[in-house]
Amino acid sequence: IVEDDVAFGPENIGVPREEIGKRIDFALDAVGMQAFRHSTPSRLSGGQKQRIAIAGVLAIMPKIMILDESTAMLDPKGRREVMDVIKKLNKERGMTVILITHFMEEALEADRAIVMHRGEVVMDAAPEEVFSRSEELEAYNLTLPRAAYISKKLAEGGMPVKGAFNAEELAEEICASLQKI
């Protein structure tokens, strides 16, 4: 049962029984999974399972959460669900979240992006700054977010677009560029 999975961490660190129920409520509310409290985890989607896993960590009440490839092997909808929870925890609850990912669109949503290569930090800046250094990223076998890649290729082809990093920015840049023609 989902609530048993969420209770596992607090039980193992000795949280009193009466407090565990409150923490389960808090954690399931935080990840939007209260309606699945009595569900069988094996019947949940990949994104829902990841949200329950995050709830299990939240029930411990950490100040910092480290998530390693938390959206790997999820479909786009599941990936979006998990990223929405991560952003909510950071923005609304003030939790520090360290997200390790190979999905550049996810890295773009961070306050700070750190690129490591062979155990060394090679870039540490705002995501927009990191992604503006496309040649360096390519040297580390990292790709640009899709919109940034398209923006770069359009600029290389002569379309006057500034570096766009997401679909909305790219659409605005293309429209502005077309109005100049």
Task: Describe the residue ranges of each PLM region.
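Conserved ABC ATPase "signature" region
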Residues: 11, 18-36
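Conserved ABC ATPase signature
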Residues: 40-44, 48
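Conserved catalytic motifs of ABC-family nucleotide-binding domains
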Residues: 61
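Catalytic Walker B motif of ABC-type/P-loop ATPase nucleotide-binding domains
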Residues: 65-68
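Helix N-cap at the start of a conserved alpha-helix in ABC-type nucleotide-binding domains
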Residues: 76-78
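ABC ATPase nucleotide-binding domains
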Residues: 137-181
